[in-house]
Amino acid sequence: MPKSSNLKMQRKGSLRENGLVKGLNKNKFSISKLKELSHADDSRKSHRIIRSGKSSGEAYKQAGKGLMNLGNHLSDWGAKSSNLSLNDISDKIGVLVSELGETEIEFVKAFNENRIKFKAIRAMEDSIAPSRAHRQRLISSIEREEERDPLSPKLTDLQNQLVRTEAENLVGEMQLDNTSREVFKSSFQGLMDAFQLRAQKQMTLSYYASQLAELINDEVAYPGDNPAAYSQKYATQIMHQCVESMARLLAPVTSETTEHVGSDCEFTRKSSSSVEFSDHSQDSGDPSQQNILQVKNVQAVLSIPEAESYKAQLLSSIAEEQKKKELQAKSTVFL
């Protein structure tokens, strides 16, 4: 078992220290820096979020293309092998590796859709920037006029302008606040859902690819040995099960599945392909049918309210177990 220290997050609960984020390079000059300068000061931080998200999406896309090429080369390499197991398994694993690359490409689409939502916040910040600047100029003008001549008639006009500007600014600030909360929530909920779906797909595909690799006999062979003959039947069964698991993963949630899972666990949904695998024999009398994989559904990724409910139930069960242990300890002492 790994040490508990290895299971900790590499970052603290906040990236800020004294209100600043360490290691954030803002002074590096580039073409994208020129684009950033075209936006108001108030919207440059949101512009950096959009820009850095774009580079991250491109990196995921390149990784997906690389995996698809890897799968193609793997299948091409195995086609020339005289070993039947290598020939067949390399082709099938190549298919699954290519599918892993395809999941990256699909993830990038969802990633960009949610990243672009931040443009609404940037546009709102750009639109409210002139009002903020005008308000600040009026405040500075009033301060200068008061220092020069406290009885100046211009003060009344400037103060009236400031009242009107602050009223307009108040409406704009409220619109910005509403837009920021709505877009931030929608964007990152969609983004985290995309991460969860990508992880489930990769978990499913990588598991079956690992099971295919297990079918290869890696024992050392010597001249004159007669290794066991390879049968494509088990590899074909694994591929069929993989297809079925991926289909279940992408199947929409229905009221029937929700009610069925709700009877077992109130906070889970049966919309995921999160799978657990167990060895099962189709025919107990035939030893050749041993270790055939069988898939069964387990709980899916929880939504935020469901996760909170699960957390509350989990804490409650832990508290009850702790009370039982304390009562048992007390009864032991009395005895």
From Swiss-Prot:
Q: Which domain of life is it from?
A: Eukaryota
Any idea which UniProt keywords this protein has? Answer: Cytoplasm, Cytoskeleton, Meiosis, Membrane, Nucleus, Sporulation
For the keyword Nucleus, the answer is yes
Q: Where in the cell is it found?
A: Cytoplasm, Cytoskeleton, Microtubule organizing center, Spindle pole body; Nucleus membrane; Prospore membrane
Q: Name one Pfam family in it.
A: Pil1
Topology in the lipid bilayer: Peripheral membrane protein
Coiled-coil stretches: none
Instruction: Please give the InterPro entries that the UniProt record associates with this protein.
Output: AH/BAR_dom_sf, PIL1/LSP1
Give the molecular function GO annotations: lipid binding
GO biological process terms held by the UniProt record: ascospore-type prospore-specific spindle pole body remodeling; endocytosis; lipid droplet localization to prospore membrane leading edge
One Gene Ontology cellular component annotation?
Answer: cytoplasm
Function of the protein: Has a role in nuclear division during meiosis II where it stabilizes the proper segregation of the spindle pole bodies. Also has a role in the formation and extension of the forespore membrane.
Report the protein name in the record.
Meiotic expression up-regulated protein 14
